[in-house]
Amino acid sequence: MKIKGVIGLALGVVLGASAASAAEVTVVRDVLGPEGPVLVDGALYYVGWVSGTLSKWDGAKSVVLNNLSGCGHNGLALTARKTFLLACTDDPGSVLEMDMTGKLLRRWNADATGRPFKGGINDVVVTANGGAYATLWGPSTDLPTAVIGGVLYLAPGARDWGQVADGLDYANGVAVSPDQKTLYVSETVGNIMQTYTINADGTLSNRSNFALLNLLTKNRVDSWWLGPDSMKVDAKGNIYVAQWFGGKVLKLSPQGKLLHEFDIAAGDGTTNIAFSEDGNFLYVTVVKDPNDPQARGSIVKIPNVE
């Protein structure tokens, strides 16, 4: 999640939240704009959108692998080639491909027609066949304005991205079902999640409303920006979505039913999730105060639930 200036001031009083798990442990501190956690071979990779960094935590210490201005590091995904795709939210946005050491291998600044990625790229996910989807965000202003969000697709072996969905209100997180037939997309403005059918050629159809989060959980504050951020899907097809300004992670069934609510004590700006290798724990990136322009935050580890 990245919003320039004052980050969407909340207009209401914070609602009482259920007690956070006593087992919540902070594993990484002092991250400026924590996002994009990915666990690879026991190491946790993550980004800072304010610091413009890609870092690696080995269980004891963090090392910065990449420090690149003009990107606004955000979503991160691992490819089958053991490279990273990185979403850049600076407007216009970019998608970067980097090796595991943070070395830049490739940069896309426009789609196949030459159109710049207006609104910035927010998140990215890799499919089982080697393709990838990325979300187009929107103007990073104090209050949301133009509805220009969409979804881009990079087909396996293709040179360029093509747009496969539009008309989304600040498209944010993106994820794929285990059977590779459904694409989940979060619209932060509106506090809603959408689904699409993934066609054989990677195009999308049958856009449908999946979950309206304020019907599943009480809003913690009144804010334009309270809504779903990034998400991950487990092997059973359950969706774990971070709620920006909500201070929580929601576990949803493939049918959109709320299965569990994880309240995060470390802050209200939950942004993303990674699973431990055995699936028994979640690593959650969280900003303490979403109104903080520096987006000071951390990564916490919490137990998962069945």
Regions found by a protein language model. Give the residues of each.
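Short glycine/acidic-enriched loop and turn motifs that connect beta-strands
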Residues: 51-53, 91-93, 139-142, 190-192, ...
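Beta-strand initiation motifs
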Residues: 21-24, 60-63, 102-106, 154-162, ...
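A short loop-to-beta-strand structural motif that recurs across blades of beta-propeller domains
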Residues: 53-55, 94-96, 149-152, 192-194, ...
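Beta-rich, blade/repeat-based domains predominating
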Residues: 29-42, 49, 68-88, 94, ...
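Beta-propeller domains
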Residues: 45-67
